[in-house]
Curated annotation (Swiss-Prot):
Residue sites binding an (S)-2-haloacid per the record: L11, Y12, R41, S118, N119
Protein name in the entry: (S)-2-haloacid dehalogenase H-109
Enzyme type, top EC level: hydrolase
Practical uses of the protein: (S)-2-haloacid dehalogenases may be used for the biodegradation of halogenated substances and their derivatives which are widely used as pesticides, herbicides and other industrial products.
NCBIfam families per UniProt: HAD-SF-IA-v2, HAD_type_II
Length: 224
């Protein structure tokens, strides 16, 4: 691996816990919070992938709302616009993983430039980062909105490389999502896969450069 000159992080699942919406889901639908969160995330991802395959880009907020509508229908839950809006807002207030802040502070102190490259819209990324007071960490917030296609399309990874102005073989991509790590690896990034759940990496002809359990371990590997 070439010396690393910058880091690009995925946002949803990597830096922030997408299932921190469980509490909001549970408040709206008692006893269903966990089920809603799991299926909602699954359909959200499926809808972004299908959007790219069909060439029908729409904002992350729209696909997230559509995934929530599906989830509620699938689970037989009555919906109204107020509830849908409130749950959608929960995605703008995601909690960072417990290891995120300390790892980012350590990496920031090293002087490495850092960015987020996310399927979220500019608005979504900015809201999540600002609500958690993490703006200090990042030099760039990169949204697929610029190229109007979702990860793992190569155009998104190319946008990250162009924005950071660092050759791809010196730009570390960090994601907890195996499909995202696979796409980034095929593009040519060295990839650190944050395997929080002890999962199996996808069998799509790529392997991560490094596998870690959390961002603390990632920063140890990169800086020690």
């Amino acid at each position: 691996m070439q010396p690393i000159e910058g880091i690009v992080f995925d946002l949803y699942g990597t830096l922030y816990d997408v299932h921190s919406v469980v509490q909001a889901c549970e408040s709206a639908y008692p006893g269903q919070g966990e089920a809603i969160s799991r299926l909602w995330r699954q359909k959200q991802l499926e809808y972004t992938w299908l959007s790219s395959l069909m060439g029908r880009y729409a904002s992350f907020e729209q696909r997230t709302e559509e995934a929530l509508r599906y989830t509620c229908k699938h689970l037989g839950l009555a919906t109204d616009e107020t509830t849908l809006r409130q749950l959608g807002q929960a995605y703008l207030h995601l909690a960072p993983h417990p290891d995120t802040t300390a790892a980012l502070r350590r990496l920031k102190a090293s002087g490495l430039p850092m960015a987020i490259a996310s399927n979220g819209s500019h608005h979504s990324i900015e809201q999540v980062v600002s609500h958690s007071d993490m703006g200090w960490a990042f030099d760039h917030l990169i949204s697929v909105e610029t190229v109007k296609v979702f990860k793992p399309d190569n155009r998104v990874y190319s946008l990250a490389e162009q924005t950071m102005a660092i050759p791809r073989d010196r730009l570390l991509f960090v994601s907890s999502n195996s499909w995202d790590a696979t796409g980034a690896r095929h593009f040519g990034f060295p990839v650190c896969w944050v395997n929080r759940q002890g999962a199996v990496f996808d069998e799509l002809g790529a392997t991560p450069t490094r596998e870690v359990r959390d961002l603390g371990e990632m920063s140890d590997w990169l800086l020690d």
